[in-house]
Amino acid sequence: MPNVLSDDEELLNGLGSEIMKPSRQGNHMARTVKRWVNKERATTADLKNVNIDGVHGPVNTESYISPGQLYSTDSGNLFHAGRILVVLVGLPATSKTLLSVAITRYTRWLGVRTKSFHFSEYKESAKNIPSDYFCVVPTSKEGVAFVEKLRMQMLNDILAFFNDLSGQLAIYDALNIRKIDRKNLETTFSEIGVKVLFIESIVSDQEIMNRNIALALESNDYKGLSTDEAIDEYMRRLSVNEPYYEMMTHDEELSYIKYINLGKQIIVKDNIHGYLVNKIVFFLMNLRQKKGCVYFARCGTSDKDNYIHDEELNEEGIHYSQVLKDFVLQRIKQKRQAKKNSDSLVEVIDGSHDEDLKTSLIVWTGPRKRTHDTALFFSKEGIKVQQRSELRQLNPGSIADLTDQQIMDKFPSEYKESLKDPYHFRFPRAESYHDLAVRMEPLLLEMEHTSKDILIIAHESTLRVLYGYLMACTCVELPNLNFTRDKLVEISFSPFCNTVELLNIPLTS
């Protein structure tokens, strides 16, 4: 057998490392070479402490391990992909920021060290901003100098991310609508061994364009302007840049993806970047503009709350189910009414929209009886309820239905190990949270594909994984997230980050 370790450094702590030495027999066939290195000790966390979207947080090179990460390497690079720069291309209000943040969230979840760099953020931190900064070719000397200064600052930060922070995927979010600018980026980064992939976002659908414009007008660029003034200013910026827009073509000899109307059509040219870029393309095929919120709720109670016996709801659990249904429907109706009363241009930025609840709300539940039965009152209202096998709770294996003291007595060494790394550790014949996250990836993609309001009724273990993805939690935080039955978790979407609100369910009247 060839020496796998010397054949490819990527297998050092990843796929295939277990074949280098005989495995030690045990309850869960422990590895002799650690897959996870430099792991932080887990600390307690609740939703109040992790209610800020972590998608823009720093990547800690010493301990960066993501919930969906399959393996780790010494270099930090995964999927044999090397370093990649993704360059967004498009006019204002064509979903470039939405794409950059969504790709960042997904690839970070996979374990790729990713960071998005937004021109708008650099502009907001600058002083003495000239009035023509928004044009790809400013008309004043001050504007030219200002844009060039910010551009160089962004490029230097991207280089530092690759060289100093072991970054693997950087996303450059700016207009990049001229061929000469794209060619310069390709030349600059190819010379240092960074592959460059362009994603051109094209929006011709008027409904998508209108919502993008409304979202853009909510940004700091238009702060203090009336609605009419903001629209006029936006149209001025668009008209100034349109003459310089050169759509990507084959004669540029660049690798690119044309992303048309938020995934209704995707064109890929010269994809020479391998598996990781293919994962990104597949993700983009599933990505849609969000018009709804995601709600998380625990299932109702049963008499013994056992794992082994698939119990039915008790009287308290049935009462909870009725109250949950009333509360969720009331919340959605309130949000829609608030939208109607608002003079904001953002049609559905907070998740409310105009469709009937029977068609605009979907309920996903786990496969166990009490989880599905918690949603029966929604079915009676004519709302679609789906049992999802992916929402099957974490399998506790040999420790099912044991108390903490019983686990300590029966599995003392395993219990101590589980405290060191509760995310990756498996008890005998059990799943780890990592196993759960990997098998739930198809559901994450379907959640990205759905524009409706979604209520997910599930066990706490699966809610932790879903919340961890949407709020970019680390694998240190995720196992300790606390979901209680008296709280409904509401996650709303915006292009730059997700927001969460904890709502009190009125279980006592």
From Swiss-Prot:
- Active-site positions, per UniProt? D173 (proton donor/acceptor)
Binding-site list for ATP? 90-98, 212-217, 415-418, 460-464
Q: Which residues carry this modification: Phosphoserine?
A: S6
Q: Which SUPFAM superfamilies match?
A: P-loop containing nucleoside triphosphate hydrolases, Phosphoglycerate mutase-like
Residues reported to bind beta-D-fructose 2,6-bisphosphate: R298, Y433, R464
One GO term under biological process is: fructose metabolic process
Query: GO molecular function: any one?
Result: 6-phosphofructo-2-kinase activity
Q: Which reaction does it catalyse?
A: beta-D-fructose 2,6-bisphosphate + H2O = beta-D-fructose 6-phosphate + phosphate; beta-D-fructose 6-phosphate + ATP = beta-D-fructose 2,6-bisphosphate + ADP + H(+)
Residue ranges of the region described as Fructose-2,6-bisphosphatase: 292-466
Query: What residue ranges carry the coiled-coil annotation?
Result: none
Residues of the region (6-phosphofructo-2-kinase) are 6-291
Task: Give me the Gene Ontology terms describing cellular component.
Answer: cytoplasm; cytosol
Keyword annotations of the record = ATP-binding, Cytoplasm, Hydrolase, Kinase, Multifunctional enzyme, Nucleotide-binding, Phosphoprotein, Transferase
Q: Family assignment? A: In the C-terminal section; belongs to the phosphoglycerate mutase family.
PANTHER family xref list? 6-PHOSPHOFRUCTO-2-KINASE/FRUCTOSE-2,6-BISPHOSPHATASE, 6-PHOSPHOFRUCTO-2-KINASE_FRUCTOSE-2,6-BISPHOSPHATASE YLR345W-RELATED
Can you state the subunit structure given in the record?
A: Homodimer.
**What is the name of this protein?**
Putative 6-phosphofructo-2-kinase/fructose-2,6-bisphosphatase YLR345W
